[in-house]
Regions:
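A structural boundary/capping signal
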Residues: 2-131
Length: 131
């Protein structure tokens, strides 16, 4: 890599999207794979990033990357297209346009506790009953 030309986060996200977009179910059901690939690529560039979670409906989960730069946090979501077809190149911004996704943003530990609670409540039974 040319040290004078450091990749910006949005360009890196676009490369991840381009690579995964050949998969038949992309962007649906790909937020875990895409966000992990993006997280690893951004970390390799020395960027301060973490995974964050949200949901629109009880039992539905969504994972994306948050980058912290100069005290500001920016969402990088390579699979936001599944929520809004106006974002084929992913979403980059301070807050989600979808009010439910924005309202329900949470950190990994809290989200995993929520998922466990929902499992215990039987929320996921309908998903597993057909298998």
């Amino acid at each position: 890599m040319n040290p004078n030309k450091k990749n910006n986060s949005e360009e890196i996200m676009h490369r991840v999207i381009q690579k995964l977009s050949t998969q038949p179910w992309f962007p649906n059901d790909y937020c875990n794979i895409a966000s992990k690939a993006l997280l690893n690529a951004l970390k390799a560039e020395g960027k301060e990033v973490r995974l964050q979670y949200s949901y629109t409906e009880k039992g539905d989960g969504h994972r994306f990357v948050v980058e912290k730069k100069e005290g500001e946090e920016t969402i990088l979501d390579p699979t936001y297209l599944q929520y809004d077809k106006n974002y084929p190149e992913g979403f980059v911004g301070q807050s989600f346009p979808d009010p439910k996704l924005e309202k329900n943003r949470t950190e990994e530990k809290d989200f995993m506790e929520l998922q466990k609670k929902r499992y215990e409540e039987g929320v996921y039974d309908k998903f597993f009953s057909g298998k």
